[in-house]
Amino acid sequence: MTRGTAEKAGLHPPDPPFIYRLPTASRRIPPAALFHNGPKGSSTKPMHRIPFDRVNWITSSFLIGTALIALIGVPIYVFNFGIDLFQVTMFFLYLCATMMSITLGYHRLFSHISFKAKWPVKVFTLVFGACAFENSCLDWSSDHRRHHKHVDHDDDPYDISKGFFWAHIGWLLFKLNPEPPMDNVADLKKDKLVMLQHKYVHWIGLVVGLILPAVLGYAWNHFMGMNPWHGALGGFLIAGVARVVVAQHCTFFINSLCHTVGRQPYSTKHSARDSAIMAFLTFGEGYHNYHHEFQHDYRNGVKPWQWDPTKWTIWALSKVGLAEGLRRVPDAKILLAEMHEARRRAHARIEELRATPISEHGMAQRAAEAAHRAADALHEVVEQVSKNYHELEKSISERVQLSREVMREWQLETRALVRQLRESHAFA
């Protein structure tokens, strides 16, 4: 029911939800599921309440419970029993295996099919992907494909327009709409390994992700002549629970932070952003603006200086025969996207600078004149980049291969435009 029809029916239009915003999704569910309104005709303001009937209790209990154990249990353990190099090493090895299984396996291999992998790679990523407790590869891929298809819209599972909290974790805690059918993963349903993991994903995660670290901690302490049960508890808490929490929230931050903070060098048609910090924390997944523009590329960080260990691992696997069919976007198309976005931003900035009113007063007059000079200088650079853009667009359509020297020159000119754009913000 829309706000207009609600008013006609004599109902009070609801205020925004208690934590996250649901500007469009809330239309699909009864208002009473989210709000408690006062008696009709009363002046009492609507009382926000948590939609307990829509809480995903199993998922919520796990996410909140593991976070509390990590935040409270781990410090208590370290304070009482200390922490040794074995536990730290096991934590980081497990974290790397888990994160790589999500980024390389769940994401780039299964969700986007950006390359093909042999069975050992599939088995490894499916086993340790289960240890992240982010659901099965089939479920994860289905959600992610819908995210790309409907990004920033109502059918996007972790739509950032509903708020940071919703995109980060709220979509997992609450199920406000019926689960959509998994009708976008027909290819994965034909993969026996994927379906086997889908059937036993929670058992795999429990045994390999939580019990095995405890067993290894027990064995290590027993071998070293220390209390084995202290080692078992440490393995469970540190390499098990704490590692799960860290891995999950690194993934969640891609859905929230990388749609909120960062640069958009390739497109502003969607909210995805590039973040070098998040790329470092997520094995290269932080270059999210590029990824949303070219989702089937096996790379996320395409620049030589960009941190993307997932890309390097896929490349290394291809060299030893464990991966093949690596998909990559041609450099010309990447540069064309950069040029298009730089030109769009430059034209908008030129209009802003030229709209600065000329004043007859001292400092204001000098500032306005400087802004107009900056607009003229920016115009000269954008004209050259526009010329390059049209030539590149024509060469792509006619399938003409440009020399590396020409491409390099155009890249430098585009970067110069971007740099001048940043400098122009020193003016009005």
Give short role names for the model-derived ranges.
Residues L188-L193, V261-Y287:
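Active-site-proximal inter-transmembrane loops
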Residues G235-L237, L257, Q264, T268:
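Generic preference for hydrophobic/aromatic residues in regular secondary structure cores
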Residues M99, L104, M278-H292:
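Pore-loop/selectivity-filter region of tetrameric P-loop cation channels
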Residues L257-G262, F294-R299:
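Interfacial helix-loop-helix junctions of multi-pass membrane proteins
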Residues M1-F252, D297-A428:
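Non-catalytic, topology-defining segments of multipass membrane proteins
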